[in-house]
Amino acid sequence: MAIFEGSFTTASTLKVGIVIARFNDLITNKILSGCLDCLKRHGLDTSELSNQVDIVWVPGSFELPIAAKTLMKKKSYDVVIALGAVIRGETSHYDVVISEASKGISQVSNENNVPIIFGVLTTDTMQQALERAGIKNNLGWNYALQAIEMGSLIKNLN
């Protein structure tokens, strides 16, 4: 019986793309910071001159799938992390954005055989988003861990 798992010890060999929404940037900047901190602590070069990590900013979470798709056509990545924050408002816009962003990201991931980590916070309030972006816990760190594990797993399976 063969058992395959992702490895955190080979993280420094990964090529990571990050697509991030500018909308709600008070939140997304904090998530990005946590994400980059985790990647750096696991051996990736996150400096501005890095060839290991690329960051693409988009207007909002709805645009994350097309940016991820275009990014993957340009370079070869082991994993992509999609970061955003969608906070429920008084209209149905929230539901549309979350539905289309999640479907689009999943579709792009499957079409390209590259894992895309869904790091889009979906909260009812700004307070909930702030708690998940650093007041209590920074989920950016968790998204980076998922990226390391999935990137190394798919790399090993290929």
From Swiss-Prot:
Q: What does this protein do?
A: Catalyzes the formation of 6,7-dimethyl-8-ribityllumazine by condensation of 5-amino-6-(D-ribitylamino)uracil with 3,4-dihydroxy-2-butanone 4-phosphate. This is the penultimate step in the biosynthesis of riboflavin.
Q: Catalytic site residues?
A: 93
A molecular function GO annotation: 6,7-dimethyl-8-ribityllumazine synthase activity
Record EC number: 2.5.1.78
What do the Gene Ontology cellular component annotations say?
cytosol; riboflavin synthase complex
Residues annotated to bind (2S)-2-hydroxy-3-oxobutyl phosphate: 90-91, 132
Binding positions for 5-amino-6-(D-ribitylamino)uracil per the UniProt entry: 23, 61-63, 85-87, 118
Keywords for this entry? Answer: Riboflavin biosynthesis, Transferase
Q: Which InterPro entries match?
A: LS, LS/RS, LS/RS_sf
Family the UniProt entry places it in: Belongs to the DMRL synthase family.
What Gene3D superfamilies does this protein's entry cite?
Lumazine/riboflavin synthase
Q: Kindly name one Pfam family recorded for this protein.
A: DMRL_synthase
Which Gene Ontology biological process is one annotated for this entry? Answer: riboflavin biosynthetic process
Protein's name according to its UniProt entry: 6,7-dimethyl-8-ribityllumazine synthase
Q: Which pathway does this polypeptide act in?
A: Cofactor biosynthesis; riboflavin biosynthesis; riboflavin from 2-hydroxy-3-oxobutyl phosphate and 5-amino-6-(D-ribitylamino)uracil: step 1/2
